């Protein structure tokens, strides 16, 4: 049976399992960044894990705070992955719908955003209620929160990346009439 598992920073075996899952999903060449993310971004409030009864890790999802100074916090969903032998079972969809989104709403996030790892995932995330976002421009004021800024400094030597809003898909948690461009020719 699959169940929600708490994140414990002191659990070295869990850290190794998360790193292995990320490496399998996104490639070994990213290992230095996965390790930096573990050091700066993962914590019990922002990390969602699914495990089997034997404690073997099945899925991982991370929430990174991004801030819009006029509109509040946004949850950047980062490194969402399910172990290959469990893909297609709906585990990540259930984790997002039943655990992540309700907690994000409860914690006062304005919405969630993400970058699909492949174009084939666009339809998958649309089924969660996400919409494609037109290319960001400098008028979009969302920037990394404190933990994300610390990570970016460690990873890249800069507190921000070239594009202040790297998200390609977005899901506001309430009605929006703001300037975020939720309509694209691909929707």
Summary of predicted features, one role per range:
Residues 82, 88-102:
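Conserved acetyl-CoA-binding loop-helix of GNAT-fold acetyltransferases
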Residues 77, 99-104, 121:
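Short hydrophobic clusters on alpha-helical segments that form packing/core surfaces
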Residues 113-123, 138-144:
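Conserved beta-strand-loop-alpha-helix junction that forms the acyl-donor binding cleft
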Residues 19, 23, 29-53, 59-81:
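A conserved beta-strand-loop-helix scaffold within acyl/acetyltransferase catalytic domains
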Residues 1-13, 173-187:
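Conserved N-terminal entry element of GNAT/NAT acetyltransferase domains
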Residues 103-117:
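Conserved GNAT acetyl-CoA-binding A-motif
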Residues 126-136:
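Conserved acetyl-CoA-binding loop of GNAT-fold acetyltransferases
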């Amino acid at each position: 049976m699959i169940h929600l598992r708490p994140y414990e920073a002191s659990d070295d075996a869990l850290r190794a399992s998360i790193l292995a899952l990320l490496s399998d999903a996104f490639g070994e060449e990213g290992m230095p960044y996965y390790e930096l993310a573990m050091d700066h971004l993962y914590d019990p409030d922002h990390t969602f894990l699914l495990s089997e009864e034997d404690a073997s890790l099945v899925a991982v999802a991370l929430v990174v705070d991004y801030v819009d100074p006029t509109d509040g916090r946004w949850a950047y969903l980062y490194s969402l992955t399910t172990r290959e032998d469990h893909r297609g079972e709906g585990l990540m969809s259930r984790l997002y719908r039943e655990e992540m989104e309700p907690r994000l709403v409860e914690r006062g996030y304005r919405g969630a955003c993400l970058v699909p790892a492949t174009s084939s995932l666009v339809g998958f995330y649309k089924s969660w209620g996400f919409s494609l976002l037109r290319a960001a421009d400098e008028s979009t004021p969302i920037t990394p929160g404190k933990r994300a800024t610390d990570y970016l400094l460690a990873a890249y030597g800069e507190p921000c990346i070239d594009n202040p809003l790297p998200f390609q898909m977005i899901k506001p948690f309430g009605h929006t009439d703001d300037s975020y461009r939720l309509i694209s020719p691909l929707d």
